[in-house]
Design a protein with these regions (language model features):
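Noncatalytic, beta-rich nucleic-acid-contacting surfaces in large DNA/RNA-processing enzymes
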Residues: 399-403, 550, 625-629
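OB-fold/S1-family single-stranded nucleic acid-binding modules
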Residues: 620-636
Length: 636
């Protein structure tokens, strides 16, 4: 694996460091140089932008009217409410689509209206807006349809709506096609031509939230707006994290404030969901927990059965009924995991047996009857393991349905657009697509995409690489630094968890294997070109100022960020002496690194170069600062 150091802009970082030193954030002076380097490395080099990034609040949300089409959409929606017209919200079956329905439906109801909703069945209807659904809605008296997280390429659906006398408002975040946007009454999408909205990377629920925000600004008092916006923030945070959009700008406001609100949810369905995910203990949640424990259960409804269960869960007022729905989602998620394992086993065998398939620049895998609900997440797994753009296709008789995921260097939507004549329909983003095609075209698609990728990629694009932010010797790792790094949370797309490099650290004992794949180590810092020989574990009990080190996530939130998103004040003085730092051993966890350690045949006393992230172990008995290893090699 290649280690790549992100470039440092020291002059800008030092200017920002001075501004932060004088700010209201009260960050420890010893942590400021590292924090400033990290912010500038993320493109945040102005004091005002840094303050907003570290301490976002509701005031950092943009005016919804800055989005093209918003005023016209609000005018039409208000007219529907005044005339008590039937309104239908047309969503999608993933987390983003179902939560977008929840947000907009709730906002309409709070503003005195009512709305029905439709979530397509993944297998029977597939992705996108169907003509027959619109025709049926028109026959039932619906006069306004609002799409959420879908519709930006629904040209036929827009024509059907116009023919049946239904006004269609499209709200979406997916990229428009080369021929523009549908001829709907209004199209709201920050990515459409001519839209100057500052945050281009909203998820579908984020766009729906902006419509809901605009509606509440028109129809509710200011005090009610703030309270309800904070309530919606929890739901839009789940969608924003689950849809893996960049956690910058407005998305960061959603995620940061929403995660704080998830500590104490009011919504009965959300409480039941957190319970079944074993997260309902009142502690602060992380983006990782949302991505891997909440989102999969919500996604399981659309993957394995009927996604309207998600909307019903958030609508439910009775706790016992909510627990039953949440339990059903949990069971569906278990079924999804088993189906995913079955398909992955099949795929791994094929990749091992077919070198030409394994060595393709764009891997196209197909199987008869593979469950459509899990092919997307399976494609993600293949990309993670093999580092190549991957499409996974389920063949069902004469028709085939596919989902693709990509690597940073390859724009997958452009790739499938280049062979659109082979496809029945398609859509997506640079690194995630969905599509359908005749089964007879699968082999043609495989050949075309491999040729297309070979013309644009090199073998270096497939080589695993690890980007690290800067070198940070273990002797400079302190509780105050960790406290400052917490301000950068939540981590995700384009705001990944900081990764540091430390050279010539000493391995204090042989690695301990954990569940066959992982390892636990103890490492100590190098000291003045040498390595410490007498060290003590870094735990709260041995720290000279043990009371200052939090050992529970509950405490971490108290000293890290306030409930309103602002930073708490902390002492700018450090009680840790340099001599103490030089004589501390850190516990380190290497997830998936057992094979690397076995290959290196590590022994106590070996010197290593490590790439690591810094975290806090919450265990009440032996918690404290802990390193998460990203990679390790013998010191040069």
């Amino acid at each position: 694996m290649r280690w790549i150091a992100n470039p440092l802009n020291s002059p800008k970082a030092r200017v920002l460091e001075g501004a932060l030193r004088d700010s209201r954030l009260k960050i420890s002076a010893s942590a400021l140089p590292v924090l400033a380097d990290l912010l500038v490395g993320r493109g945040i080099d102005e004091p005002e932008a840094a303050a907003c990034f570290l301490s976002p609040g509701l005031g950092d949300l943009h005016d919804p009217l800055r989005m093209s089409g918003m005023k016209a959409a609000l005018d039409r929606l208000e007219a529907a409410l005044e005339r008590k017209e039937k309104v239908l919200i047309y969503g999608d079956y993933d987390v983003d689509g179902t939560t977008a329905i929840v947000i907009l439906k709730t906002a309409i109801e709070l503003c005195g209206g009512a709305a029905e909703f439709h979530v397509p069945h993944r297998i029977r209807e597939g992705y996108g807006m169907r003509d027959e659904v619109i025709e049926r809605a028109a026959a039932d008296g619906v006069r306004l349809i609002i799409s959420v997280d879908t519709g930006i390429r629904a040209f036929a659906a827009a024509e059907t709506a116009r023919r049946t006398g239904v006004d269609l408002i499209v709200t979406d975040h997916h990229l428009p096609g080369p021929t523009g946007v549908p001829q709907a009454l209004v199209v709201i999408n920050p990515n459409q031509d001519g839209c100057d909205y500052p945050c281009k990377h909203l998820c579908g629920a984020g766009v729906a939230f902006k419509l809901a925000q605009g509606l509440m600004q028109r129809r509710l008092e200011a005090k009610d707006q703030s309270r309800l916006l904070m309530s919606f923030m929890k739901v839009v945070a789940i969608a924003t994290i689950a849809d893996a959009v960049p956690l910058l700008g407005e998305n960061r406001v959603f995620a940061k404030l929403g995660l704080q609100g998830l500590r104490r949810p009011v919504n009965v369905g959300l409480k039941a969901l957190l319970e079944v995910a074993k997260l309902g203990d009142g502690r602060a949640l992380t983006a990782t927990e949302v991505a891997f424990r909440i989102a999969p259960r919500l996604n399981a409804a659309g993957r394995m059965d009927v996604a309207r269960d998600v909307v019903d869960l958030f609508d439910e007022k009775d706790m016992e009924r909510a627990r039953k729905i949440a339990g059903r989602l949990d069971q569906l998620n278990a079924e999804r995991q088993e189906e995913e394992r079955r398909i992955m086993d099949n795929i791994e065998r094929r990749l091992e047996e077919e070198p030409a398939l394994r060595e393709a620049y764009c891997v196209v895998l197909d199987g008869e009857g593979w469950h459509r609900g899990v092919i997307g997440i399976t494609a993600s797994r293949v990309v993670e393991r093999h580092g190549r753009p991957t499409l996974v296709i389920s063949c069902e008789g004469d028709e085939a349905y596919g989902s693709g995921r990509s690597i940073p260097a390859f724009h997958l939507l452009h790739a499938i657009e280049s062979c659109h004549e082979l496809l029945s329909r398609y859509g997506g983003h640079a690194h995630a697509v969905g599509f359908a095609l005749p089964s007879a075209n699968v082999e043609k698609l495989r050949v075309h995409l491999d040729d297309y990728a070979r013309a644009r990629l090199t073998p270096a694009d497939f080589e695993p690489q690890l980007e690290f932010d800067r070198e940070l010797p273990l002797g400079e790792v302190t509780p105050e630094l960790h406290q400052a790094l917490v301000l950068l949370e939540p981590f995700g797309m384009e705001n990944r968890e900081p990764v540091f490099a430390a050279r010539a650290v000493r391995l204090m004992a042989p690695p301990q294997a954990v569940k066959d794949k992982h390892v636990r180590l103890r490492v100590a810092p190098a000291v003045n070109g040498a390595v410490a020989t007498a060290v003590q574990d870094f735990t709260p009990r041995c720290h000279p100022d043990a009371a200052a080190i939090p050992t529970h996530r509950k405490e971490r939130d108290e000293w890290g960020t306030r409930q309103d998103g602002g930073a708490s004040s902390s002492s700018s003085s450090s009680s840790s002496s340099s001599s103490w730092r030089d004589n501390v051993a850190f516990k380190a966890m290497g997830w998936g690194l057992k094979e690397s350690c076995d290959r290196l045949q590590l022994l106590a006393g070996d010197r290593l170069d490590i790439a690591y992230s810094l975290g806090m172990n919450d265990h009440p008995e032996f918690g404290g600062l802990e390193l998460t290893l990203r990679d390790l090699v013998r010191a040069r």
